[in-house]
Amino acid sequence: MSLTMKNVEGFVIFLVIFTSTAAVPQLQKALDGREYLIETELKYNWHQAWHECARHDQQLVTIESADKNNAIIDLVKRVVGKSHNLWLGGNDEYSSSRDYGRPFFWSPTGQAFSFAYWSENNPDNYKHQEHCVHIWDTKPLYQWNDNDCNVKMGYICEPNHFRETYDQALKQKCEAIKITNSKISTEFDQLHAKQSLEFDSITQNVAKVNEDWKIEIQKLQNATQIAIQQIMENHEKKIRDLSDNLLKQLQDSNEQLKQSTDHMNASFGEKLKGQQAENNEIC
């Protein structure tokens, strides 16, 4: 049965998708709590492996302690099974020395090795061409070997140290900003509460002064009214007393006038009567 062009195209698309999916290594969590990316299917030289890690925002792994080495060995056992050729992040900066004790450095950090897990008689810099470090598949204990950096093999990546340091510093800075903002917010709330209390106190004092002022004004008005009333009463009493005195004087004057008139009339009547009697005697 012949394949049609459509079938061929479908097969090619499936193959591309399958290959792309299979080629993406997955992060695996180790006993130390860190996540590592292990590539065993596709092969790269050391520099290509470095760039592959960078594409995933990672770096070739650095192993600074026995604990970290044991965690990675345990992870490789669980994920891969047996020992594999896997690039690590170390190299000797292309030293020409074949001395086993020549210095090696972790390229992601620039730090010299403080821990190593070399296989027997290594690092030997065979033919002066072995400058990059890897886990060796010929050693069941997952020991290290120096090899030509152009040899292709798998690799192990870990989170970028500088990115982690930057993220940690950024996180600490953000936390510090949050603490500062929280402190400022707390201080503002406390100041606002204090000002509110002071404003309430001032408002209450103003209200009290206003109330006291009203009371004093009322007292003054009452006192003024009482004083005016007293003055009016005293004035009325003086007028009444004066009127009564004038009336009494008038009555006394009338009485005196009456008495004087009566006396004058009586005296005049006596004189007139005597004169009449005299006239009668004469005439």
Swiss-Prot record:
Entry keyword Nucleotidyltransferase: no
Domain C-type lectin: 51-159
Keywords: Disulfide bond, Lectin, Signal
Keyword presence, Disulfide bond: yes
Signal sequence annotation: 1-23
Cystine crosslinks: 53-157, 132-149
Inducers of expression: By injury of the body wall.
Molecular function GO terms recorded: carbohydrate binding
Gene3D superfamilies found in the cross-reference section: Mannose-Binding Protein A, subunit A (3.10.100.10)
CDD domains: CLECT
Pfam families xrefs: Lectin_C
InterPro entries: C-type_lectin-like, C-type_lectin-like/link_sf, C-type_lectin/snaclec_domain, C-type_lectin_CS, CTDL_fold
SMART domains: CLECT
Summary of the function given for this chain in its UniProt record: Role in the defense system of the organism against microorganisms. This lectin binds galactose.
Protein name listed in UniProt: Lectin subunit alpha
Species whose genome carries this gene: Sarcophaga peregrina
